[in-house]
Amino acid sequence: MKDKIVFTVVLILSIIYIVIGNKIAMKNNSILDQVSKLDYPKGEVTRIIERKETPIYVDGLEDQYNTDITFEAQVTSGEHKDELVIATQNISTYISGTIKEVEVDDKVLLYNTQTQEGQSIWYFVEYSRTDALIVLALVFLGLILLFGKTKGVKTMISLVFTVLSIFIVYIPAILGGQNIYAWTIVTCTFITISTVILVYGCSRKTCVTALGCIGGVLVAGILTLIMNGLLNLTGFVDENAIYLQQLNSKIDLKAIIFGGILVGAVGAIMDVSIDIASSLNEVASKMERPHFKDIVKSGFNIGKDIMGTMTNTLILAYIGSSLSTVLLLTASSHSIAYLFNLEMITVEILQALAGSIGILTTIPLTSVIAATLYSYADNSKNVYKYKGGAQKKLVTQKIDNTKDNDDLVLTSENRTSSTSTSSKRTKSKH
């Protein structure tokens, strides 16, 4: 009953955070106000009308041309739903490379514009890929329910709040030019607390997990702030940063590096924290009187097994996300020293190292917090068994170094008692 009440309260508070957070983030947010007015209806290609190639001449390049494909499509969403429209796809080998040409039955996104004479002109924008992604997401959620059952449902709910906190609150706040540092800390804290309570309930283990995770995230954040100054970072790591600056000059690009590192690392740090907290909770529950030093030592031993795989996971995730950039720069004619001093590469390395250090510091932090909270517990229990009006006390098993000695003492006492009884019987016979 208590767990249900806690779950319901956290669920309501999470909804309140999303609603109020979105209102604060959207305050005076002119960028998203403009984006929300844009409409890209979906359509399905019904036939190809014309394909026209026009050669273009670029210095030093041969066989460059523009291709205009005129096609008919049926609009499947928006105010023009079910209408047949004529649209154009433009492909330039000089700019776009090998973009796939539209074919019959392709699902596409369209854009409609009006000429001065009031005539509608439709253009191909992009292929509609959401349907396949939705199917894949449903498979993912189905597997969570299949393997997790009740906890799987809680995991799905926490995942929904995590996604909403990023896309409904955090990103609008950044685009609105608000304090990225503050919003990053708030978002990571919300994700951590809501996830561990919704999935694992409210307990000492949950408290240890949350505190350990937040501590690891703060260490990664402080390290990032220090390195931002030492590395003379500007935040202009690629062309996307330039576009962001043009959208809103109030956006702090250096703070985006900070936010990217913390948000990217919070999941792995939380994973390490819950692994250690859960393991130490089990270890402490088997001790009659848990000792601080023993729990800390166990936490460090468990952490040694975790750190290798989790650190590799984080570093490989960062490398994989920027693999094309790494390949391009590696294949260039620049020296290794030049490549490693590029801000783009420096930021990638900083992300991997700061996140990994956050994971490593989470291990001792979580171990110490767990030892502090778990060592107050008294797990000694005496079970009483009643039979024939006589009260017999059963000795609880102890998991400590004195177990063997206690067993020897009990065995000796039993043998002494048995010997005494035998002697008395012998005397009575005589």
What residue spans do the PLM features occupy?
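Hydrophobic alpha-helical transmembrane segments of membrane transport and translocation systems
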Residues: N301, D305-G308, A317-H430
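Generic detector of multi-pass transmembrane helix bundles and their immediately adjacent loops
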Residues: G221-I357, T366
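Transmembrane alpha-helical segments that form the functional core of multipass membrane systems
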Residues: L138-Q245, I251-G264, A268
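Alpha-helical transmembrane segments and their helix-start/interface "positive-inside/aromatic belt" motifs
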Residues: D3-T8, R204-V217, T309-T313
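Structural detector for short beta-strands of small beta-barrel domains
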Residues: S36-T67
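Membrane-entry signal-anchor segments at the cytosolic-membrane interface
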Residues: M1-L13, R129-A137, K154
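Extended, hydrophilic extramembrane loops/domains of integral membrane proteins
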Residues: T93-D131
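Hydrophobic secretory-pathway targeting helix
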Residues: M1-L38
